[in-house]
């Protein structure tokens, strides 16, 4: 199954919850008036798009309708697709243009951080990259063992210390090992704690310092892993993490198990952070680059 087919199948619940409701609104009106926009905005809000983004989409739609002279509600779907694709367009590429590139993976426990690292390591190795993984989430019981299982499956090296060790020390060793082994990419797991923001911030700053001091020429990608099934809560998490880290991209997991896949839209619209990768299944090769146009086509097809 190609990725577009996987995406389409993964977005089925979201399509049923969001796109079909939008179609329902469109089909129930014979003209585009204020009632139409109100109904559409309410539908978007109820589909986890959030009040701010829903209002912005409807405002953009009003302008498009006026500019194009559209009077038939049936033509609105095409305009909506264009508006949503425009919102999602951004720097969706994962940059691996330095050797090594360092990827810091952050996110709360349970969002799918460890799984994402395993799948990303597998993807990169499959494309010919040499990968080293740093098990720097040293606080959560079993995090290191879990990551070991995934790196074994992906066939990549792991650098680990004992549970409770200093995460920055693990990252330091991983950078040194990565350079010695001529690695293309070093992926660093981090502790998934948000309840103590100061600790998290201090820890991420310390890790960033280690990276900057020991791999000064490396590009650093900081990826925030969010669970699509949590809906608006994912936007709130992203907002909090944005205050503590310089996030370069989002990885949205569990897109296949939720009707809340529309959450991608407010994350980009309200926070300005591009989605770079999406998880659409449980298999090791089910983490794929996010292509906005494919997402919109799969949603509204």
Q: What are the language-model segments listed below?
A:
Residues 11, 48-50, 108, 137, ...:
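Residue-level signature of catalytic and energy-coupling elements of molecular machines
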Residues 146, 167-181, 195-301:
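Conserved catalytic-core segment of NTP-binding enzymes
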Residues 17-136, 143-164, 169-188:
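Primarily NTPase-proximal linker/entry elements flanking Walker-type ATP/GTP-binding cores
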Residues 191-193:
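Short glycine-rich anion-binding loops that position phosphate/pyrophosphate groups of nucleotides
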Residues 34, 55, 70, 74, ...:
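Non-catalytic, surface-exposed connector residues within folded enzymatic/regulatory domains
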Residues 51-53, 140, 256, 284:
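Short hydrophobic/aromatic residue motifs in ordered secondary structure
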Residues 1-25:
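Charged, compositionally biased N-terminal leader segments and the immediate start
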Residues 136-139, 163, 229, 255:
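Structured loop/turn residues at secondary-structure junctions
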